[in-house]
Structures are given as structure tokens and as C-alpha cells.
């Protein structure tokens, strides 16, 4: 299991943010390449996530079960999916929590695993790709809130475009390089004290 613990801020209070990030339709519309297709009788949300890597397209179809604790603004997400064309499988488990006063601090902690042809890519760069997708999600959800504030109603959501592997991998590599440079320069600075 590849572990991921991320925090991001949305410059709005949790009472405005939580109703949106606890709405699966809004969340799917704000994640690049994600789409909800149905709600099953047992409460699972079925959908798909599309990733484009140059000429290769991976479409993971699957379902997610969401368990909410609205008073503390927390949600447990358990998801699984399969890319039938490439025969890769993915599984994830995350806990999401929103806290704060004027700014919402969202913490996402858990892990994911990919088996099959995309396993090596996920192991090598999956965390960086996840960080890029989370950053895009945070930007998109903040934009939705701003639209709703400006119009005074529930603005119609446009689906975020499919996740472009070239764009995401480029940003993920840049993110990874920044992390390495930060660690190296931090160690040098500590040595110069």
C-alpha cells in the first residue's frame, strides 16, 4: 500500500466547504477525469476516472463507499476500480477531515495500491500524481464556492477535464524535484549553522 498524507487549504470557512466536499457529485466534478455514473441501493457510488498518458488512456471503473461523520466534518472513503483495457486494478482507503475557522484545512490520510501494468508507474510516481490531483481539486472546489457566492445560488458545475498524464506527470516531476531540492538545501543549511 502506498501511503499518502496530504493537507491543503481552501480560503473559506468549513461551514461553506464541508457541504460541498461531502457531496459526491460536487467532488467528482472537481476531480480531473472523474465522473459519477450511479448510486447503488447499498449506498456505494459507482463511477470512473480517466487518465491520459500521451496516446494511452486508462479508464478505471469502480465504486466508492463513503461513511460520513458530519458533526466533526470527517469522511472515510473506501474505493476500488479496474482498468479493463489494461487489466490494472486499484484500491484506496482514505480518511478526509475538514477543520479551521476562516480557512478550511483539509487533511487526507490513507493509501492506495495499483496492481497490473500500471503498478510500476503508481509505485514510482503515484504520490506525486495524487498531490497534483489534490491541488487541482482544491482549486476547483474553491472556484465553485466563489461562483456560488457571486451568483447567490447553486452554480452549475462543469465537469473537470480528463486528467492529462503529460500535464500531471510534468507537474508531479516538478513537485518531486522541488522536494529533493528542498531536502538537499535544508541539509546544507543545517550544516552551515
What are these regions (language model features)?
Residues 6-8, 34-35, 61-68, 79, ...:
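Hydrophobic/aromatic beta-strand elements that line small-molecule binding cavities or substrate pockets
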Residues 13, 41-42, 71-72, 99-103:
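Short strand-connecting beta-turns/loops that link adjacent beta-strands
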Residues 17-21, 27, 66, 108, ...:
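Hydrophobic pocket/interface hotspot
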Residues 39-80:
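Glycine-rich portal/gate segments that line the openings of hydrophobic small-molecule binding cavities
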Amino acid at each position: 500500500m502506498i501511503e499518502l498524507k496530504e493537507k491543503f487549504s481552501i480560503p473559506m470557512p468549513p461551514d461553506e466547504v464541508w457541504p460541498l466536499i461531502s457531496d459526491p457529485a460536487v467532488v467528482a466534478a472537481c476531480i480531473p477525469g472523474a465522473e459519477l455514473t450511479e448510486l447503488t441501493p447499498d449506498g456505494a457510488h459507482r463511477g470512473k476516472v480517466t487518465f491520459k498518458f500521451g496516446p494511452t488512456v486508462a479508464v478505471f471503473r469502480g465504486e466508492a463507499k463513503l461513511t460520513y461523520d458530519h458533526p466533526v466534518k470527517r469522511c472515510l472513503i473506501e474505493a476500488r476500480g479496474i482498468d479493463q483495457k489494461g487489466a490494472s486494478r486499484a484500491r484506496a482507503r482514505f480518511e478526509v477531515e475538514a477543520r479551521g475557522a476562516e480557512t478550511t484545512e483539509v487533511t487526507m490520510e490513507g493509501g492506495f495500491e495499483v496492481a497490473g501494468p500500471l503498478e510500476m508507474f503508481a509505485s514510482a510516481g503515484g504520490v506525486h500524481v495524487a498531490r497534483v490531483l489534490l491541488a487541482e481539486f482544491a482549486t476547483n472546489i474553491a472556484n465553485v464556492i466563489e461562483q456560488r457566492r457571486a451568483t447567490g445560488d447553486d452554480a452549475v458545475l462543469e465537469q473537470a477535464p480528463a486528467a492529462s498524464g503529460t500535464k500531471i506527470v510534468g507537474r508531479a516531476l516538478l513537485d518531486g524535484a522541488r522536494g529533493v531540492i528542498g531536502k538537499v538545501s535544508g541539509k546544507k543549511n543545517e550544516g552551515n549553522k
